[in-house]
């Protein structure tokens, strides 16, 4: 179904997360959702594991130094079926806005690099997990499964997709997304050091510069999508929180100013300064993708499925299975199991949400648009 709204305002968040502090992280999330709502945005995009911040310290410390930080990080990760997540969903509903949220999800005793796309009525339209954590991230997070890696969702503002970090350079994930007609893409990025910090053996790709200025626009060019590419930022105080005793403090400025927004032909439409903290805006016009798609639609006329095809397996592989009533193998949907399909309570119009009563009353009357 074609998008009902083709022209609208969207925002990408470049801000400092609430390091090791779930409650602070949630308050910051709701603040930026409210700010995007006040600005008239239909969509707001947060960075990778915005809650409770990216564990960049895992790249800097040894095993013993990491243990107290890892414990605190796990204690402040976000459970999907929690009051904290419901507050975020309610903020999306109060502002009648789509929210792409990156968070460290704790499910039983495993963490995942997760994203949700929340609708303007607070429903979770997409729940996905990074399919393979990168290098030392494997010491913190587990892998996504078959039913948690697809991302493109039809909405009334277009077909919206989301990926985390180096997933945005994964040719197979890009092929899958473009084949589903993606129009707006959220490339969630963590906090990343500038190339000046690179040591001789460290690949250049492991710095912010190529990811901000090559990977993200390449995604836009190859898929002819708008790409919102939010990064986290960090302050001197944040560096102190993320650095254990005995480890040299780094200059926080070497990690900031990496957020970008690109148009469907790869042009940079918005670029953040190092000291900028706030929302980057873009005026999206879905019709701007017509000519880039006319020249090269890799999910349509510019591909040869008779020669090259991608096999996608969206089945969840169970650790323990049980027979169902028909004698087959029982299964479940992860999004349902973790409580993200649980409906919210009725909208409130008299609470201290930060949104005016008039706006709350108006937004509460709006119908869901799942597409």
Swiss-Prot record:
GO BP annotations, alphabetical order: cyanide catabolic process
Reactions catalysed: formamide = hydrogen cyanide + H2O
Induction line: By cyanide.
Root EC class: lyase
PROSITE patterns: CN_HYDROLASE, NITRIL_CHT_1, NITRIL_CHT_2
Region (Disordered): 326-356
EC id: 4.2.1.66
InterPro entries assigned: C-N_Hydrolase, C-N_Hydrolase_sf, CN_hydrolase, Nitrilase/CN_hydratase_CS, Nitrilases_CHs
Active site: 48 (proton acceptor), 130, 165 (nucleophile)
MF terms (GO), sorted A to Z: cyanide hydratase activity; nitrilase activity
Listed Pfam families: CN_hydrolase
CN hydrolase domain: residues covered: 8-286
Record keywords: Hydrolase, Lyase
Family stated for the protein in its record: Belongs to the carbon-nitrogen hydrolase superfamily. Nitrilase family.
Subunit and partners: Oligomer of dimers, forming left-handed helical fibers.
Function of the molecule: Catalyzes the hydration of cyanide to formamide. Degradation of cyanide may be important for plant pathogenic fungi in infection of cyanogenic plants. Can also transform some nitriles like 2-cyanopyridine and fumaronitrile and has a minor activity with 4-cyanophenyl acetonitrile (4-CPA).
HAMAP family assigned to the protein according to its UniProt record, in alphabetical order: CN_hydrolase
Protein name: Cyanide hydratase
Phylogenetic placement of the source organism: Eukaryota, Fungi, Dikarya, Ascomycota, Pezizomycotina
Gene for this chain: chy
């Amino acid at each position: 179904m074609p998008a009902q709204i083709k022209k609208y305002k969207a925002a990408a968040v470049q801000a400092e997360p609430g390091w090791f502090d779930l409650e602070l992280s949630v308050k910051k999330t709701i603040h930026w959702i409210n700010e995007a709502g006040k600005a008239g945005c239909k969509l707001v995009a947060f960075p990778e594991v915005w809650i409770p911040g990216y564990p960049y310290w895992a790249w800097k410390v040894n095993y013993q130094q990491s243990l107290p930080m890892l414990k605190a990080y796990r204690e402040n990760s976000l459970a999907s079926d929690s009051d904290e997540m419901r507050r975020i969903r309610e903020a999306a509903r109060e502002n009648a806005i789509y929210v792409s949220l990156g968070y460290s999800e704790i499910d039983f005793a495993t963490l995942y690099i997760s994203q949700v796309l929340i609708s303007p009525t607070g429903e979770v339209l997409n729940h996905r997990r990074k399919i393979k954590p990168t290098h030392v991230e494997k010491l913190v997070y587990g892998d996504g499964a078959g039913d948690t890696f697809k991302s493109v969702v039809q909405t009334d503002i277009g077909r919206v997709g989301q990926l985390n970090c180096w997933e945005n350079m994964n040719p197979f994930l890009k092929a899958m997304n473009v084949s589903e007609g993606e129009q707006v893409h959220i490339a969630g990025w963590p906090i990343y050091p500038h190339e000046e910090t690179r040591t001789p053996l460290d690949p250049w790709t492991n710095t912010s510069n190529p990811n901000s200025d090559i990977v993200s626009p390449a995604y836009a060019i190859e898929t002819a999508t708008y790409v919102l590419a939010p990064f986290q930022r960090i302050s001197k105080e944040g560096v102190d929180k993320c650095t254990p005793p005995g480890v040299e403090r780094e200059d926080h400025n070497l990690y900031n100013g990496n957020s970008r927004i690109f148009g469907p032909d790869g042009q940079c439409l918005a670029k953040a300064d190092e000291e900028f903290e706030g929302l980057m805006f873009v005026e999206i016009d879905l019709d701007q993708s017509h000519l880039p798609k006319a020249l090269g639609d890799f999910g349509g006329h510019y591909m040869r499925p008779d020669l090259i095809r991608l096999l996608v397996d969206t089945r969840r592989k169970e650790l323990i299975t049980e027979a169902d009533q028909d004698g087959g193998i029982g299964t479940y949907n992860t999004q349902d199991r973790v409580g993200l399909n649980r409906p919210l309570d009725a909208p409130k119009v008299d609470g201290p949400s930060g949104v005016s009563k008039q706006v709350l009353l108006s937004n509460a009357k709006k119908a869901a648009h799942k597409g």
